[in-house]
């Protein structure tokens, strides 16, 4: 799926033209309305700066939170302020995303100026992908750039609908990098390819596990979902989380791995807690010795060694989902050890891809984000791409 990119547009093509750029500025705020993490804003800078340097007039569209209609707390005003600081130029802010005020401010833009539209989700038509709303959004622009990978799995007006009215419709640098890493890892990886899948529920990762069993050489499973596999094997799991309706599925996934010659690794020991709390009493036991009344909240030290050995000779690793309840320091060791392991093997040329969601937070928590080859900015979008699904926001872009 090779898409036309913003890099392929020359200054001659776009100088003086109006670019509608879909970004993902859904950043966290504190109670005072200050941005606590501007990673997503920084991630969009390469695309914005490329367009301004080529003389385009840049119109940015983003969602912010989940408003039901206009919500004063979910205006993009703090984002405009932070973006102005990062770009070193004033960003024009509108109070709406369509209509006369927007048209007037866009008409006044000089080449290289940047304007930020108000939260597109103030209109319910955005998530319904309403063609009339998409047409109004597109009316102020000449061409379209999608640089919001995190919403690419949604067919919304600003991610999919507008492409019907604007040409060219191209991928921004962030989307291009996501596709380059995630797709090549699935379609054409350097082998051995290992996938590490964690998280609490098998049900949310079934699609990914099934797809990866077709593609990878080794599959490592951690997190709460391991107890569904253990119970399916007939082991006692105490009070650990189990999805009773997924026991047969767990058996069939193990059988499928065997049949395909994929090395499927589950932890050999676990760290147990007597209740779900950061200060719970804990003990480490082998998986055959889980007593009643205890629940597993992390993988144990032996499992870490087994996983490290399995990862030592890999050339590509995809990691999605933590090994335990890493929000509790007492049960974070397994997740942190995997992060350190990936940082180490990355130094010897292994491509390490963090596939969105909680694993990103885990890698950032231990300060190793800059040592990974690629950290995906999409949670659901990364998962769907790894599952081999078509993402509407990507499919709608022009072919290269």
From Swiss-Prot:
Substrate binds at residues 24-26, 40, 63-66, 121, 154. GO terms for molecular function: ADP binding; ATP binding; phosphoglycerate kinase activity. It catalyses: (2R)-3-phosphoglycerate + ATP = (2R)-3-phospho-glyceroyl phosphate + ADP. GO terms for biological process: gluconeogenesis; glycolytic process. Keywords: ATP-binding, Cytoplasm, Glycolysis, Kinase, Nucleotide-binding, Transferase. Its EC number is 2.7.2.3. The keyword Cytoplasm applies. Pathway: Carbohydrate degradation; glycolysis; pyruvate from D-glyceraldehyde 3-phosphate: step 2/5. It is found in: Cytoplasm. The keyword Aminoacyl-tRNA synthetase does not apply. It holds the Pfam family PGK. GO terms for cellular component: cytosol. HAMAP family: Phosphoglyc_kinase. Belongs to the phosphoglycerate kinase family. Monomer. This is Phosphoglycerate kinase. The gene is pgk.
């Amino acid at each position: 799926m090779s898409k036309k990119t913003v890099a392929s547009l020359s200054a001659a093509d776009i100088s003086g033209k109006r670019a509608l750029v879909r970004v993902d500025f859904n950043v966290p705020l504190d109670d005072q309305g200050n941005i606590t993490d501007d990673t997503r804003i920084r991630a969009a800078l390469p695309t914005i700066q490329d367009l301004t340097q080529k003389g385009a007039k840049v119109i940015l569209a983003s969602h912010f939170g989940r408003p039901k209609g206009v919500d004063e707390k979910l205006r993009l005003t703090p984002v405009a302020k932070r973006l102005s600081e990062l770009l070193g130029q004033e960003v024009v802010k509108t109070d709406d995303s369509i209509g006369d005020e927007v048209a007037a401010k866009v008409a006044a833009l000089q080449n290289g100026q940047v304007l930020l539209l108000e939260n597109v989700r103030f209109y319910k038509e955005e998530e319904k992908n309403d063609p009339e709303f998409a047409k109004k959004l597109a009316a102020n622009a000449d061409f379209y750039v999608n640089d919001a990978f995190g919403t690419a799995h949604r067919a919304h007006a600003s991610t999919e609908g507008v492409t019907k009215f604007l040409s060219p419709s191209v991928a921004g640098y962030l989307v291009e990098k996501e596709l380059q890493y995630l797709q090549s890892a699935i379609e054409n990886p350097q082998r051995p390819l290992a996938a590490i899948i964690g998280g609490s529920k098998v049900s949310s990762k079934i699609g990914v596990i099934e797809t990866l069993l077709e593609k990878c050489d080794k599959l490592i499973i951690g997190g709460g979902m391991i107890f569904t596999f253990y119970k399916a094997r007939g082991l006692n799991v105490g009070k650990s989380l189990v999805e009773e309706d997924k026991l047969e599925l767990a058996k069939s996934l193990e059988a499928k791995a065997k049949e395909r010659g994929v090395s499927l690794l589950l932890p050999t020991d676990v760290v147990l807690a007597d209740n779900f709390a950061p200060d719970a009493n804990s003990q480490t036991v082998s998986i055959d010795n889980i007593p009643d009344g205890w629940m597993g909240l992390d993988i144990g030290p032996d499992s870490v060694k087994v996983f490290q050995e399995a990862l030592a000779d890999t050339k590509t690793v995809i990691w999605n989902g933590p090994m335990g309840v890493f929000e509790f320091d007492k049960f974070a060791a397994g997740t942190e050890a995997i992060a350190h392991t990936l940082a180490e093997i990355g130094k010897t040329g292994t491509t390490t891809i963090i596939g969105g969601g909680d694993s990103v937070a885990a890698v950032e928590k231990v300060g190793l984000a800059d040592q990974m080859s690629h950290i995906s900015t999409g949670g659901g979008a990364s998962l769907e791409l790894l599952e081999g699904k078509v993402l509407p926001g990507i499919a709608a872009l022009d072919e290269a």
